[in-house]
Amino acid sequence: MELHAKLVRSQLSFFKPFVAGLSLEATRKGQDKLGELMTALHRREVLVRDHDFEHFQGAWVMPKDQRRTGVILYLHGGGYTCGSLEYAKGFAATLASECGVRVFCPAYRLAPEHPYPAALDDALESYQYLLQKGYEPGQIMLAGESAGGGLIYCLCLKLKELGMELPCGLIGISPRTDLTGSGDSYRENRENDPSMTPELL
């Protein structure tokens, strides 16, 4: 493992007991602050334009130096319980800046206030919105981290169920795909994960 990776893991491990003890409200606030910081880091490189849906909000994050056509539909992480539009914009700003392509990020509705299938419904509405904007499925890339990584797979299954054309590709960043917590990896990596515990998941 490279030195910088070891440093990151050690820092995350330090915060692990604190994160596990945070309330939902505190976790949400912390994630929002992280998003604001990420957006600030890229403020000279991107333009941000909010977009309102009936039940949720989204935003366009556009690189000033656009190098590619198409769009990334980014679904944020947060265990389906955390992640506001500010957090989504932060991660989207990083994607837009690094990839040189437009990113659309919905702040899908969260549990426990809005249980399943609210998040999936909002993800589907966001995909349909991009189609209405004139993007072809072959021009749309789905990306998501953690819970958002799992949600992009759920969205593709829903599109397949509806007989809709699938996007050109998927980028799952540490996707959460086992909501039952019954996989061997939960037990085998219990002490290895630098920031999460099975109980927190």
Regions found by a protein language model. Give the residues of each.
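A glycine/proline-hinged amphipathic helix-loop "lid/cap" segment
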Residues: 1-66
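Alpha/beta-hydrolase superfamily serine-hydrolase fold, recognizing
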Residues: 47-201
